[in-house]
A protein has these predicted regions:
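Long, polar/Ser/Thr-enriched low-complexity segments
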Residues: 1-127
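C-terminal tail/extension regions appended to the core domain(s) of diverse proteins
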Residues: 7-11, 44, 51-52, 58, ...
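Charged linear interaction tracts used for macromolecular binding and regulation
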Residues: 91-240
């Protein structure tokens, strides 16, 4: 790319050279190097672009399916940073598919490998990352257990009186492109409560087919005359993948 020199900047193509404005400056470059829809679809030089587009589209659809299924926990999160992190997450999981050839790699096949599962496990949707050193997930019973949960160890947001805990399991069927969320009963613990063991169990129908992704939902609550109000800001609630 070269800069134009002259009193009047040119725009257009002359003798195989493209003249155009870029960031307020008149520049010129050899014509024919740009991308066109026809070239992307048919040119052998664009094969890698086609492969990337195919896999990117697949990951984007899976990301939307997964995120939409978590609406009861996430609500209407207009968060571009989260969207970007989720997209990068599913691209990385797709890369764990070592069976399919490039351009046909899939998130589902990536989740069949330990590397793919480890990428998803521990993913936190908000800046509120709940300590889980004393917690573990049992996939066989779809139960998450805290051997000792100590509310006093947490830094409660101003006005909060309780913390609510709930386990969700997303059944992600990538063949039917369907995702269903099943949830446990919620457990509320008092801000100054004593350490206690907590178990959260989610019932899932026997015929549910797909990858079972367990998420721990937690949020601060304020008790106002017996009515509980949740905090929706980023530091007021959280959602974390705890098992696949």
């Amino acid at each position: 790319m070269a800069k134009q020199v002259g009193i009047i900047p040119l725009v257009g193509t002359i003798d195989g050279v493209n003249f155009y404005m870029r960031k307020g400056k008149a520049v010129a470059r050899k014509a024919g190097g740009g991308f066109t829809g026809k070239a992307i679809k048919n040119s052998t030089n664009m094969e890698r672009v086609r492969e990337n587009n195919s896999e990117f589209g697949h990951c984007s659809r899976v990301k939307k399916l997964f995120k939409d299924s978590l609406f009861p926990f996430l609500g209407k999160q207009r968060n571009e940073e989260l969207q970007g992190r989720l997209m990068q997450l599913f691209i990385s999981i797709k890369n764990a598919d070592l069976v399919s050839k490039r351009g046909q790699r899939q998130v589902g096949l990536g989740l069949q490998h330990a590397d793919g599962k480890s990428l998803l496990t521990g993913f936190c949707f908000t800046s509120f990352n709940l300590p889980t050193e004393n917690g573990f997930y049992d996939a066989a019973t779809t139960t998450y257990t805290f051997t000792e949960f100590a509310p006093k160890s947490l830094k409660f947001v101003t006005g909060a009186t309780h913390l609510e805990l709930q386990l969700g399991v997303v059944v992600l069927d990538l063949e039917a492109m369907k995702a269903t969320l099943f949830s446990s009963d919620a457990v509320r613990v008092l801000k100054n409560g004593a350490p206690q063991a907590i178990s959260l169990t989610t019932a899932i129908p026997n015929d549910a087919s797909g990858y079972k992704i367990a998420v721990l939902h937690y949020r601060y609550l304020q008790d106002v005359n017996g009515a509980f109000y949740g905090f929706q800001e980023q530091k007021g609630f959280g959602l974390m993948v705890v098992g696949v």
